[in-house]
Amino acid sequence: MNTKIGLSLSEKYYWSWKTKTSNCPCFSCSGEGNIVINKVSGEKYLQYNLTYLKDIWAPLKELNLEKQFDIIALVRGGGLTGQTESIQLGVARLLCQMNPQNRSVLKPFGFLTRDARIKERKKYGLRKARKAPQYSKR
């Protein structure tokens, strides 16, 4: 029994993924449909934002598996939106790991696609990444 996350090694699935600047190892096991993020309930961690919760459950709803699995995620870095996207991607990859036939159902909805956009760095001489100081001709 892995006491750190409360799962035995024989009944859990694991996948780790990154989105933007957030990193999210996800674990899944059979259960009643609970979400635990960083050892806190998912609703409380995501500040009771229903949009974030729907995004996490979307891959499971497409496969009609909402009440069959518990999701445990350990998220680091980024904001709540980036963390939610990385959890969603981790859940979708877990479902493909459990059953490779799920890939054909999840792929058209974009659940298996990583959003590769990241923040552009600030360049010297500029105020932000691309914002230049005002130009004066004379």
Curated annotation (Swiss-Prot):
Q: Which UniProt keywords apply?
A: Chloroplast, Plastid, Ribonucleoprotein, Ribosomal protein
- Name the domain of life this protein comes from: Eukaryota
**Entry's InterPro entries?**
Ribosomal_Su5_D2-typ_SF (IPR020568), Ribosomal_uS9 (IPR000754), Ribosomal_uS9_bac/plastid (IPR023035), Ribosomal_uS9_CS (IPR020574), Ribsml_uS5_D2-typ_fold_subgr (IPR014721)
The molecular function terms of the Gene Ontology recorded here are: RNA binding; structural constituent of ribosome
In terms of SUPFAM superfamilies, this protein maps to: Ribosomal protein S5 domain 2-like
The yes or no answer to whether the keyword Chloroplast is present is yes
Q: What is this protein called?
A: Small ribosomal subunit protein uS9c
